[in-house]
Amino acid sequence: MEVDLPVHNEYDASRFHQVTIRDPIAGADSTFTIPTRYVNLSFLNAGAQGTVVMADDLVTTQRVAIKKMQQPFVMTMSAKRAYREFILLTTIKHPNIIRLLNAFTPDTSLSTFREVYLVMELMTHNLHEVIHRLRLDHKTLSFFVYQSLCAIKHLHNSGVIHRDLKPSNIVVNDRCVLKVLDFGLARKKNVDTSMRMSDYVVTRYYRAPEVILGLPYSEKVDIWSVGCIFAEMINHTVLFPGKDRIDQWTKIYSVLGTPDDHFISQLGQSAAMYVRSLPRHQARAFSEIVPDTNFLPETENPRVHLTPHVARDLLFNMLKINPEERYSVEDALNHPYVKLWFKDDEVNAPASENRYDQEIDFADKTLIEWKELIFNEVQRYQADHDIFTG
């Protein structure tokens, strides 16, 4: 539904208009105050971080996605996430990372500032929808994993760990081009990760063992997440569907087996005692975890290593409980199952400039201070870009 509403006096009515969009899932309305270049809005999806619509851009004549950040200034945590996502989207650039086309606020002063909008390239589906609607052939499985790895390699080279990879944060189009989005939980690689991550609320199913058990973590948490997503693409079900943190660990070790003493010795005292108190499990064979019957046999191509056996070998090395034994992103990109797609300009693209200040993750800022930081960044973006006709 598209309805023009009276424009708030704070907005420039010659440049902005208001459109109310109905969320058919939640049964709620959301009002978008956007430049007049964007018309024909329709609901795309909604989540904890915001509402996303499709729109026509009259300037570029392209269809775009517009995300209205969901109440970014209600809590400190949501404001921090909004700031982090805004900075990273404006700086990280790679073919497999969603591209920011425009960003703006209709609010003209800090005192009235309450809305932030991000305009991005439109992708037709998220990976969650694809996984649960289609059986994917080997070529598509391989291509999706390759592109996911290219995206996280670029993030890692740019000093960023995504930390929240999951099917709903990955989008694809009808040409099977894949892009990663949602950087609200991303963090710089070289911060102190030995402390517990108070704001690390990545979807539990894709959470690495070292995070669950309170160990320091590295960029290999992203490899674990891609491995879980890869298995889900094959099986069409979540690999480790834990009900809570403890059950998540139970699901993992009951499939992959009890870790060795070297790994357990690295845990804190209480975590080590807990892990040792559990019944020991032998690892299940990966031929049981992702059986041949879950692949499309007619799409195998042994000449380029597109077989269940080779796919399982990649998965086996991505889903190591001990991150020291787990594949790096470079290891994974050189694996036969995905190497057929290797393009140097995709795999080794120059690192993006990263203006995100790692120290700000630990800064004790008030909600008003976070709001001012975001306002200043949006104003900077608007000063550097023509948001109305550029």
Swiss-Prot record:
The modification Phosphotyrosine is found at residue 200. Induction: By B.thuringiensis pore-forming toxin Cry5B. Its cofactor is Mg(2+). Disruption phenotype: Temperature-sensitive sterility in both hermaphrodites and males which, in hermaphrodites, is associated with disorganized gonads and with impaired production of endomitotic oocytes, likely due to a defect in oocyte maturation which often results in vulva protrusion. Both hermaphrodites and males produce sperm but it is defective. In addition, the formation of P granules is disrupted in later stage of oogenesis and the protein levels of glh-1, a component of the P granules, are increased. Old adults are bloated and move more slowly. It holds the Pfam family Pkinase. One of its GO terms (cellular component) is nucleus. The active site is at residue 164. Keywords: ATP-binding, Cytoplasm, Differentiation, Kinase, Nucleotide-binding, Oogenesis, Phosphoprotein, Serine/threonine-protein kinase, Spermatogenesis, Stress response, Transferase. This is GLH-binding kinase 1. It comes from Caenorhabditis elegans.
